[in-house]
Amino acid sequence: MADLKKLAEEIVGLTLLEAQELKTILKDEYGIEPAAGGAVMMAGPADAGAAEEEKTEFDVVLKSPGASKINVIKEVRGITGLGLKEAKDLVEAGGKIKEGCDKAEAEEIKGKLEAAGAEVELA
């Protein structure tokens, strides 16, 4: 049981690039495909009825690359600094492009990606 807990902690601690590499390994070597939608539901706070504070940190989430996948890959490379293959894999898989940015930066990134043809949301 302790080994499983340690494994879970390691998985949760992965960076975005490491998680993308793990996905690729699971797909290529073991034939495990990501679930459709790829969303993981997490339990909300215990006091969901209380007034929420205004959010100060945002995650930019790619929902769909749209028809212009190449333009979206170029923008993702510029935003994240990833290599071509890593950016392509990230765009094809969808998910978080950038985590923990302020509202202005998140809106700017969202605008760039949408201008390139992607469907993006802020979380």
UniProtKB/Swiss-Prot annotation:
GO cellular component: cytosolic large ribosomal subunit
A Gene Ontology molecular function term of the record: structural constituent of ribosome
SUPFAM superfamilies to which the protein is assigned, alphabetical: ClpS-like, Ribosomal protein L7/12, oligomerisation (N-terminal) domain
Ribonucleoprotein in keyword set: yes
Keywords: Ribonucleoprotein, Ribosomal protein
Domain of life from the UniProt record: Bacteria
Gene Ontology biological process: translation
Description of how the protein assembles with itself and partners: Homodimer. Part of the ribosomal stalk of the 50S ribosomal subunit. Forms a multimeric L10(L12)X complex, where L10 forms an elongated spine to which 2 to 4 L12 dimers bind in a sequential fashion. Binds GTP-bound translation factors.
Family the UniProt entry places it in: Belongs to the bacterial ribosomal protein bL12 family.
Function, in words: Forms part of the ribosomal stalk which helps the ribosome interact with GTP-bound translation factors. Is thus essential for accurate translation.
Protein's name in the database: Large ribosomal subunit protein bL12
Species per Swiss-Prot/TrEMBL record: Roseobacter denitrificans (strain ATCC 33942 / OCh 114)
